A protein has these predicted regions:
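C-terminal hydrophobic helical "lid"/dimerization subdomain
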Residues: 2-15, 19-31, 280-284, 325-384
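Mid-domain Rossmann-like dinucleotide-binding core that forms the NAD(H)/NADP(H) cofactor-binding site
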Residues: 170-250, 255
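NAD(P)H dinucleotide-binding glycine-rich loop of Rossmann-like/cofactor-binding domains
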Residues: 119-204
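Glycine-rich cofactor phosphate-binding loops and adjacent beta1-alpha1 units
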Residues: 4, 193-195, 235, 240-316, ...
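Residues located in well-ordered beta-strands
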Residues: 32, 43-48, 60, 90-92, ...
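Residues in the short beta-alpha loop(s) of Rossmann-like NAD(P)-binding domains
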Residues: 230, 298, 323
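Glycine-rich beta-strand-centered segment in the early N-terminal region that forms part
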Residues: 50-64, 77-124, 160, 167-169
Length: 384
């Protein structure tokens, strides 16, 4: 009866208010969450449902994608415990704080967890991820704010409600919508390369992020070469129209790309795989004067590469991290208009009760695993 209409506007508003109050009263006092307790230690626990204040909303989580940055934090112990991670979050508004007019109980939304101030030195220079406000996480399921998507409910703070919460149109699934933030990061990274139509771009790694990057790069009018160690991922890339693939378990990707470019190498290389040992092969695959984008090197450390490749060969080494408000609308339109069927990238869906298992699989990818999501909004044993 979602499309039913009452006879007068005043009655409709009254009924809507009553339904809103009834749904808000159903919110429990406790919830389940996958809680990070230390290096490689995540437990399913019962925790309080977060309280919200004025200008905030409480989100009932349906789907949260597992991001590689969360996995690195869990594995490295770089962040203090306890925390509840998960930031690729879509769900339904369960409660609204005083003063919230943009959203109502029952609205389907997806949330960003970082939004910059727009006024500081870094914002004025378009390096939003370095803004101190941006570095504050505006979504939490309790403990130190860390996203909170691996829980049943998430508190979305005021500045995220105002600028980082996006309504999901009818006909778009929670699964499709949860890709808004990762797509944003990909669009931002690609813009860093200043690609020109006709250039040859090699994308190293065809996990979900690498495949999105490759799809977007091809959309920009370039010739795309994809590489991966797992042939099923290359098959998936092929199904998205990415037909130039290199099985890196069998061939030297840099050699292949040079053979395809009259010995030069790629105009640009995107490294979409973590691991500093791959930085040098990425640089080697780029032509003299080419560009190399590090997209997955989010853990601080040291790497070995030939400095003459930058100085003498005039190759440019670039980095891109997190999302950009400048491409927020572009990323939303890309996802919500289904310019790419992102749901196809999801290989495994886990209930929250199996969240620890989901994180383990994501941290140890298999040939047949791609995007892995945790779905607090789907009970154990149920179907979508």
């Amino acid at each position: 009866m979602a499309n039913a209409r009452t006879s007068t506007l005043s009655i409709e508003r009254s009924d809507s208010t009553e339904r809103s109050e009834e749904r808000q009263s159903r919110i429990p006092s406790t919830m389940k969450a996958a809680v990070y307790r230390g290096v490689n230690e995540v437990r399913l626990e019962t925790v309080p449902v977060p309280e919200i204040g004025a200008g905030e909303i409480l989100l009932r989580v349906h789907t949260c994608g597992i991001c590689g940055t969360d996995l690195k934090k869990i594995a490295s112990g770089s962040h203090s415990a306890p925390r509840i991670f998960g930031h690729e979050t879509s769900g339904t508004v369960a409660k609204v704080g005083d003063g919230v007019e943009k959203f109502a109980v029952g609205d389907r939304v997806v949330v960003f967890h970082h939004i910059p101030c727009g006024k500081c030195y870094y914002c004025l220079h378009k390096t939003f991820a370095q803004c101190e406000t941006y570095k504050k996480v505006g979504c939490t399921a309790g403990f130190e704010p860390s996203g909170g998507g691996f829980a049943e409910y998430v508190r979305v703070m005021g500045w995220i409600v105002a600028q980082g919460t996006v309504g999901i149109p009818d006909g778009i699934s929670f699964e499709q919508a949860c890709f808004v933030e990762p797509v944003n990061t990909c669009i931002k990274g690609i813009k860093t390369l200043n690609l020109e139509a006709g250039e040859t771009v090699m994308v190293m790694g065809q996990g979900p992020i690498g495949l999105i990057l490759a799809f977007l790069v091809k959309r920009a009018g370039t010739r795309v070469i994809t590489t991966d160690l797992y042939s099923p991922r290359l098959t998936m890339a092929n199904s998205f129209g990415l037909n130039l693939t290199v099985d890196a378990s069998k061939e030297d990707a840099a050699k292949v790309v040079r053979e395809m470019t009259e010995g030069r190498g790629a105009d640009a290389v995107i490294l979409a795989v973590g691991g500093n040992s791959l930085i040098r092969p990425a640089i080697d695959a780029a032509r003299p004067g080419g560009r190399v984008l590090l997209f997955a090197q989010t853990v601080r450390g040291e790497a070995t590469f030939d400095p003459a490749s930058v100085c003498v060969d005039e190759k440019t080494l670039l980095g891109s991290y997190s999302a950009s408000v400048d491409v927020q609308e572009e990323s939303v339109q890309f996802v919500m208009n289904r310019e790419m069927d992102l749901e196809r990238l999801i290989s495994h869906r886990f209930s929250l009760e199996s969240g620890v298992e989901a994180l383990h699989l994501a941290a140890h990818p298999q040939p047949d695993s791609m995007k892995i999501v945790i779905q607090p909004g789907v009970r154990e044993g149920s179907t979508l």
